[in-house]
Design a protein with these regions (language model features):
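C-terminal helical subdomain
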Residues: 174, 181, 202-242, 249-251
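Residue(s) in the substrate-gating loop at a strand-loop-helix junction
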Residues: 141
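Substrate-binding pocket helix/loop in short-chain dehydrogenase/reductase
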Residues: 97-99, 103-109, 210-211
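Canonical Rossmann dinucleotide-binding motif of NAD(H)/NADP(H)-dependent dehydrogenases/reductases
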Residues: 3-35
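Active-site helix of classical SDR
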Residues: 122, 157, 165
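Active-site-adjacent segment of SDR/Rossmann-fold oxidoreductases
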Residues: 146, 155, 167-177, 240
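Short C-terminal tail/terminal secondary-structure segment
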Residues: 2-4, 93-96, 146, 232, ...
Length: 258
């Protein structure tokens, strides 16, 4: 599939690690030039160093800071000469709280990174896409679809991301800007951190539930194999007639309401 995004200009937030890093590498391998945004400068610089020269840049950016977001997108406009695609993958979670004991500061942090970060980056991307169109892909979550009692702030934040995606897809469609979301269940560093805060019995129960409730056996998806092709589809010419959708890449769990 190399070359399918040749000439495309993209920004990937949260692009130094996890899903974002795989997407950034996959886009460059498909011919796109990418500005990678993150706060993990060591990982971001290392990723860019591993990619073909002049195809990728890294910039430190806190997606909750409007000034940093504006400056990053202005750099993209200068370096790339415009913007065709935003893949907004930056996000975070603080699991392990019930709704009744969730601290206000945790709620504020999780909502800020996930929901406010989506608002700021999408808005900045639209300004660069308004004249010629483009594609925005936001990372949602199964938590935002069904709600998870041990991840109340994350559920609320990702629910907001999915609602925002539908709202702006409607508003920006006349400008030929598509906006879609993906709700993945992948084996990533976020998933590992979630599993790490569970005890052995909770992990065992989770694995049993996953196998019982997923038609594909409960395995976590592989980003390169199961998620990246969809992101490239939505970003490229094959995705121009899809907008306002949430694509669950989760082995069928959403289909079964699990």
């Amino acid at each position: 599939m190399s070359g399918e995004l040749a000439g495309y200009r993209t920004i990937v937030t949260g692009g130094a690690r996890g899903i974002g890093a795989v997407v950034a590498r996959g886009f460059v391998e498909a011919g796109a030039r990418a500005l990678i945004l993150d706060k993990r400068d060591d990982l971001g610089e290392a990723l860019v160093a591993s990619l073909p020269a002049h195809m990728a840049r890294y910039r430190h950016c806190d997606v909750t800071d409007s000034a940093q977001v504006t400056a990053a997108f202005e750099e993209a406009a200068r370096w790339l000469g415009g913007l065709d695609t935003l893949v907004h993958s930056a996000g975070m979670d603080k699991p392990g709280y019930t709704p009744e004991d969730l601290p206000e500061e945790v709620f504020d942090l999780v909502l800020s990174v996930n929901a406010k970060g989506t608002y700021l980056t999408n808005q900045a991307a639209f300004r660069l896409m308004k004249e010629k169109g483009g594609a925005i892909v936001n990372m949602g979550s199964l938590a935002g679809i069904r709600g998870m009692p041990d991840r109340p702030a994350y559920s609320a934040a990702k629910g907001a991301v999915l609602a925002w995606t539908r709202a702006v897809a409607t508003a920006w469609g006349p400008y030929d800007v598509t906006v879609n979301a993906i709700a993945p269940t992948m084996g990533t560093d976020v998933a590992e951190r979630y599993l790490a805060q569970l005890d052995s019995e909770e992990r065992r129960q989770l694995e049993e539930d996953r196998k019982r409730l997923s038609p594909l056996g409960g395995r976590l998806g592989k980003v390169e194999q199961d998620l990246l092709p969809l992101v490239r589809l939505l970003a490229g010419p094959g995705g121009r007639y899809m907008t306002g959708q949430t694509f669950a890449v989760d082995g069928g769990r959403t289909m079964l309401g699990s």
